[in-house]
C-alpha cells in the first residue's frame, strides 16, 4: 500500500502479509501458528511545523498546509520486520487450562531524519536537528500460563499464574 504524506515530497509505503493457521485436534486443544512479514520502505515524515504560521497567525505569513521541514535528499526510513510464533492452549477439564505463547521477531531499520527544534524569536527562522539510526534486532518471548476456574459457595474465581521470558539482542 502506498500513499502521499501530509507534507510535500513525503510518501508512506507498506507491504504486510500475516497469515495464520489454527489446528484443533480436539475440543479441548488448539494450536495457532502466526507469521508476519512487514516491509516499510517509506514512512512519511516525522517532522512538525511551528504553531505560529500554521495553527496560529504569524505576522510574517502563514505556512502552506503541506509545508515540509525536512531534507528530501538525506531523509530515509526503511524497515523490515519478520515474525513467527504460536499460541497453544489445552484444557484438562472444566477447571484447569494451560497456555503457552511464543514469538520470534527480527527487525531491520535504517532511519535518517531532519526535524525542527524551535522557531527563533524573529518568527521566521526554524532551527533544525538530525537523527540517524541503523538498527538490527532479534527477540523472542515465551509466555506460560496455568489457569484454574472454580467456585466457593456463590463466588466464582479465576486463578491465573505464569512465567514469562523475553530476550532481545540488538
Model-flagged regions — what are they?
Residues 1-17, 25-29:
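Outer-membrane beta-barrel translocator/receptor signature
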Amino acid at each position: 500500500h502506498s500513499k502521499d504524506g501530509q507534507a510535500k515530497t513525503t510518501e508512506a509505503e507498506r507491504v504486510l502479509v500475516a497469515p495464520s493457521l489454527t489446528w484443533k485436534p480436539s475440543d479441548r486443544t488448539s494450536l495457532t501458528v502466526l507469521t508476519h512479514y512487514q516491509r516499510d520502505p517509506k514512512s512519511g515524515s516525522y517532522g512538525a511545523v511551528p504553531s505560529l504560521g500554521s495553527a496560529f497567525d504569524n505576522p510574517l505569513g502563514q505556512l502552506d498546509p503541506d509545508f515540509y521541514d525536512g531534507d528530501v535528499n538525506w531523509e530515509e526510513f526503511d524497515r523490515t520486520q519478520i515474525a513467527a510464533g504460536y499460541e497453544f492452549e489445552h484444557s484438562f477439564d472444566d477447571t484447569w487450562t494451560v497456555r503457552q505463547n511464543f514469538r520470534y521477531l527480527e527487525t531491520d531499520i535504517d532511519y535518517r531524519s531532519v526535524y525542527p527544534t524551535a522557531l527563533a524569536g524573529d518568527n521566521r527562522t526554524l532551527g533544525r536537528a538530525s537523527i540517524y539510526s541503523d538498527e538490527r534486532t532479534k527477540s523472542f518471548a515465551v509466555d506460560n500460563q496455568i489457569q484454574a476456574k472454580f467456585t466457593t459457595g456463590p463466588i466464582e474465581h479465576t486463578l491465573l499464574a505464569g512465567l514469562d521470558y523475553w530476550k532481545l539482542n540488538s
